[in-house]
């Protein structure tokens, strides 16, 4: 069964909002983050996934997107804050998103220059 999503991206808490619909939420958010999504998201640096809703049909997801776009900005902010009051980026918690690797430096971490060998 195919799944569809309506989603809201933000540039920052209570910042610029973008509403979209997709059948591949992870891929689409990654496109937006890489500046390959839409011209709008690229121009306004809208990259935080702050809200999403899952649907079984494309028609239902598109209807929801159209409805959300008609609502006022205040209504949209209220929608986001009811489920995500701190405007946390939801993308890293999506099932299937690879965790960001923790880089462990190798070698000497001492910033002081090495003493020359006087032998």
For the regions a protein language model found, what residue spans apply to each?
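Catalytic/regulatory signature loops of cyclic-dinucleotide turnover enzymes
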Residues: 69
């Amino acid at each position: 069964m195919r799944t569809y999503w309506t989603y809201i991206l933000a540039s920052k808490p209570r910042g610029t909002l973008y509403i979209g619909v997709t059948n591949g939420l992870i891929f689409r958010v990654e496109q937006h983050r890489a500046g390959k999504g839409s011209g709008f998201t690229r121009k306004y640096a809208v990259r935080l996934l702050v809200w999403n809703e899952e649907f079984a049909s494309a028609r239902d997801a598109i209807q929801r997107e159209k409805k959300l776009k008609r609502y006022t900005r205040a209504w949209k902010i209220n929608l986001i804050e009811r489920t995500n009051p701190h405007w946390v980026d939801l993308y890293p918690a999506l099932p299937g998103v690879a965790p960001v690797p923790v880089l462990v430096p190798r070698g000497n971490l001492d910033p002081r220059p090495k003493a020359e060998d006087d032998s």
